Structures are given as structure tokens and as C-alpha cells.
């Protein structure tokens, strides 16, 4: 049964078609794996075993009748940010206690329409605010990876830490995730999984709990590049319920895998060589450059001059949007309600008890930068910086660059309750230093495993592409995947 959970989505599809096992047997194997591992890893907050069995039986019926859909019988984990009809959805926040939506998010609707099976809801940073999955009301997720010879619990990254940990520990065949400033790509890099943040507007945001509406984008975390391509094809769509989703055809991403990269121009931005970057990250980046060169790509040095302003601008724009989006949680119609003497006190009590420390910090920052005396000085200036960042990328692509290669993170995974990180929020925010520019510009970015550090922990590389050109990212990421090889954690859970 263990071997079934190690299959990739492409392998699952082939073996289900050949009747080597049933969708129900596969689902039972995953449910058994979750039961064994979840107490230690804390990746799932809700396991929908009965629903999963029901969906798997329906898939078996279709497989028997010869009407298999693209994800028929494939068991997936769903980040707790996606509304799932009748299934507890609370963005891992106390303030949404016992909330069961009466509707389904567009992304999950698309996945179920393609035959996928829901195993349950995955842990995450509260309201997707965090880079370590330590802000969840349900407690931290534990990374399946450990230092060579060590037994210290490490973070899986965030905010999609549950998604990355579940995929890496073989607790689902793939997972949905979201990325506002790096929340797909950083956890993927920390767990040796593949994560793609598609172009803003590629996937509908309808039914996804909002953090920062102009930055949020859904995407998959998967075992390999091919699986990520398969999942994104099903997740992506135009949606009349989300006016920011773009009405352009969704290509067959899987077809891009294996295509030659000969003649492609890969840009190397000098601004990503940040001060204090570990030598191992620098060496891995050079290795990635050589792999692309060996595959026939042309390497060109480029400049993205406004990169250094991206992180401070992001931490103005994102909290500003969050403070507005999170104003709707007041204890009146759903979720946690803490009584007070009057309605104002009830609002105050509910929000004080319901939101965690990091969420409160960001709401306060956002409210501050939007306030009358500071709006021009902070928020408008940050939006101008955002325009300049977008223009930097446009100029690079106009000059003929096809994709940009950078490190995915400034370090490997760090320890849970790391004192340095907890003492200084800015140090935690620096985890997003290589990823936020992509969200600010609305571009696609993919993180792919590329090696291990001296302690045996995974490191990833990031590829950034033109808007709506995810195909080139899958094509180039596959080259890195082929050159670097596969990385799996040693089972300790």
C-alpha cells in the first residue's frame, strides 16, 4: 500500500487505466498514510475520509465505463483557504470557527469536474500570512525533511506549508496552494517539491479566502514538474464570478515538458546576488546556469534595478489590502462571536480573540499605511514602486529574454520556534526576498528542487516567465529537474 502513495499523478493515471489497482484502493492507501503520519506532521486539519471514498467509488465507475476524465481517481489535499461546500473551511483562523461554506471555490469545482478525489483540508499560516506555517490556529506543520543525523523539527515554509509537507510525505498525490508573496514557491523549495504560481488571472480567485486581492493567486504543489503541469491545466479557467480572471485559452502544459530549450535566452539578474547570501545558494544558482547552458539555452546577464524596493513595497501593499479584506470578520453572521456590552464591544472582543498575533500585526500595518496622513507617503509610493518593478521585467522580456533564473529562497528550512526568526518579524519577511517581485509584477514563477545543502536539506531554484507563458516555465524547469535528479526525505514519521 505504501508504494501506491509514492506514485506520481502521471503514473496513477496510467495504472488506473491499466486496472492495476482501483481508485478506492489508492484512496484507502492515502487515508491509511494520513492516519499514520498526521499526528507527527500536522499537515491535515480535516480528513474527509467518507467523502474521499464516495468520490473514489464514482471514479471507479467511470473508469469501468471508459469515461475517465483528466484527474480521474487522483487523491488531492486542499489548502484550507479554498471554500469546500459543506466541509469546514476557516483559513486556519480561530475567527472562522465552525464555518462550513454553502458553495465551492471555482478551482476545486474544476478539479472535481476533472475527477479528482478530496482527501481533506490542509494546514496553513492563518489567513495565508506567514512564511513558516507557525501562525496557524491548529499549530505548526512539521517538515518531513530533517537535517542529516538530526531530529530537530523544521518548518515546511509558508503559507502553504501543509500542502508542501503533505505532498513531500506522500500524504496526497498533489495539493492546491496559494501564493501572495511566495507562499507556493518557498514551501516547495523547503520540501523538495515543485510549486508554480501562475500568472495573476490564470486561476479564478472566487471562493478563496482573500488576503491581498491584487497579489493572491492559486496554483499547485506536486511531486514533479509533469504533475504540476497536469494539475494547473485542471485548476486554471476563466470565471465570470472573478473579473480578474483572464479569458484566454488554457494550453496543454504537459505537452511543453520534454521540449528542447535550445536557443532560449535565460536571464540572470545581478540584483538577486544579495548581501549575506549563503555560498551554497550561490553555488546552486551557478549549477542551474550550467545545466541550462548544457541544454542549449543562451545565458544573458540582466538588470532588474528596482528589485531592492520590492520587499518593503510588498509589505505595504499586502497589509493594506489585508486590513480591508479582513474587516468583514466581525462575529455577526458566521465564525467566532465573543459577547460584549454593545455591538462595538462585540466586534472588538471577537476580533481580539479570533485573530492571531501575525494577522493583527498586518492589519495594524495596513490600517496605518491607509490612514489619512500616511496614504500618500506609504501606500501610493509603494504602488508606484510596483509599477517600476513590473516595467523592469517588461524591459527584460522585450529585450528577448524567455525566462529568468534565480534562487527560490535565501536559505534552507529553519527550525520550528526559531528564536532569531520569532524575535524579528523582518527576518522572517526576508524569506520572500526572491519571490515577491513576481507577485508584484503579476508574472508566473516556478520553484523546482535543485539540490541539498551541506546538512542534507533541500534547496530550490526559481524560474520566472512572461505573463501567461507558463509553458516555457514547465519546459525549462523540467531541464533542471532532469539534471538535478529526485530528492526524497528519509521516513521518520
From Swiss-Prot:
Keywords for the protein's UniProt record, in alphabetical order: ATP-binding, Ligase, Nucleotide-binding, Protein biosynthesis
Keyword Repeat on entry: no
GO CC aspect terms: glutamyl-tRNA(Gln) amidotransferase complex
Pfam families referenced in this protein's UniProt entry, alphabetically: Amidase
EC numbers: 6.3.5.7
InterPro entries the UniProt entry points to: Amidase (IPR000120), Amidase_CS (IPR020556), Amidase_dom (IPR023631), AS_sf (IPR036928), GatA (IPR004412)
Cross-referenced PROSITE patterns: AMIDASES
Gene3D superfamilies in UniProt: Amidase signature (AS) domain
Catalytic activity: L-glutamyl-tRNA(Gln) + L-glutamine + ATP + H2O = L-glutaminyl-tRNA(Gln) + L-glutamate + ADP + phosphate + H(+)
EC top class named in words: ligase
MF (Gene Ontology): ATP binding; glutaminyl-tRNA synthase (glutamine-hydrolyzing) activity
GO biological process, one term: translation
UniProt-listed PANTHER family: GLUTAMYL-TRNA(GLN) AMIDOTRANSFERASE SUBUNIT A, TRANSAMIDASE
Subunit relationships: Heterotrimer of A, B and C subunits.
Family classification: Belongs to the amidase family. GatA subfamily.
Function noted in UniProt: Allows the formation of correctly charged Gln-tRNA(Gln) through the transamidation of misacylated Glu-tRNA(Gln) in organisms which lack glutaminyl-tRNA synthetase. The reaction takes place in the presence of glutamine and ATP through an activated gamma-phospho-Glu-tRNA(Gln).
Protein name: Glutamyl-tRNA(Gln) amidotransferase subunit A
Annotated organism of origin: Chelativorans sp. (strain BNC1)
